[in-house]
């Protein structure tokens, strides 16, 4: 296959991947974990992915421990887990 053909194929695959919703792609397993504030009491706002609604919601994070379903911004949460 010529380099032009390979480039076209790569472009089409990239385009199709962008159109595929996250729900049908493999989602990070930690996106399904419940929010976990951890054992500390620093009380910072963070975001977690709520799998039933497929939305990112705010919760109070204690500042240490917890699990990986925790994001500093709603945007990072949505890009990682919601799409």
UniProtKB/Swiss-Prot annotation:
A single GO cellular-component term on record: extracellular space
Subcellular location, principal: secreted
Claim: Oxidoreductase is one of the keywords in the record: no
Sample GO molecular function, one term: potassium channel regulator activity
Disulfide partners: 31-81, 40-64, 56-77
SUPFAM superfamilies, alphabetized: BPTI-like
Sequence ranges assigned to domain BPTI/Kunitz inhibitor in this UniProt record: 31-81
Hydrolase keyword on record: no
Subcellular location per the Swiss-Prot or TrEMBL entry: Secreted
Gene3D superfamilies in alphabetical order: Pancreatic trypsin inhibitor Kunitz domain
Pfam families: Kunitz_BPTI
Stored PROSITE patterns: BPTI_KUNITZ_1, BPTI_KUNITZ_2
SMART domains: KU
Expressing tissues: Expressed by the venom gland.
Signal sequence range: 1-24
Keywords: Disulfide bond, Ion channel impairing toxin, Neurotoxin, Potassium channel impairing toxin, Presynaptic neurotoxin, Secreted, Signal, Toxin, Voltage-gated potassium channel impairing toxin
Function: Beta-bungarotoxins are presynaptic neurotoxins of the venom. The B chain is homologous to venom basic protease inhibitors but has no protease inhibitor activity and blocks voltage-gated potassium channels (Kv).
Family: Belongs to the venom Kunitz-type family.
Assembly notes: Heterodimer; disulfide-linked. The A chains have phospholipase A2 activity and the B chains show homology with the basic protease inhibitors.
Name used for this protein in its record: Kunitz-type serine protease inhibitor homolog beta-bungarotoxin B5 chain
